[in-house]
Amino acid sequence: MKIMEIEKTNRMNALFEFYAALLTDKQMNYIELYYADDYSLAEIAEEFGVSRQAVYDNIKRTEKILEAYEMKLHMYSDYIVRSEIFDDILAKYPSDHYLRDKISILTSIDNRD
C-alpha cells in the first residue's frame, strides 16, 4: 500500500471512530469493511448483494460526509491537539502527580465510547 493510501486509510478510520454514530447502518458497514477490515469492493458487493459500483459510490459519498462532519465539528483535529498538549505537559512536569491524574481523567473522557 502506498503512503498516501495508508494516510487516507488511517484518517478515514479515525473519522469513522468519531462520527460513526452519525452515519446510516449501510454507510457504517461499507466504511468499516472497506477501511478497517480491508475488504475489496467486490467482497463488500458480494456480501450485500449489490454492484461494485454501488459500493464504490456509497464509500465515496460517505468519505465526503465524514470530512464534512470534521470540517464543521473538528472532533478529530481537536483530539490531536489535546493529545499533543497532554504529552507536552507530561514531558515538562513528569513528577507532578496532580497533573498526571487530571490528564488521565481528561484522556479517559476522550477515549470513552
Curated annotation (Swiss-Prot):
Protein origin, superkingdom: Bacteria
Record-linked InterPro entries: RNA_pol_sigma_r3/r4-like (IPR013324), UPF0122 (IPR007394), UPF0122_fam_protein (IPR054831), WH-like_DNA-bd_sf (IPR036388)
Protein's job: Might take part in the signal recognition particle (SRP) pathway. This is inferred from the conservation of its genetic proximity to ftsY/ffh. May be a regulatory protein.
PANTHER family the UniProt entry points to: UPF0122 PROTEIN CBO2450/CLC_2298, UPF0122 PROTEIN YLXM
Family: Belongs to the UPF0122 family.
Protein name in the entry: UPF0122 protein Sez_1013
Source organism per UniProt: Streptococcus equi subsp. zooepidemicus (strain MGCS10565)
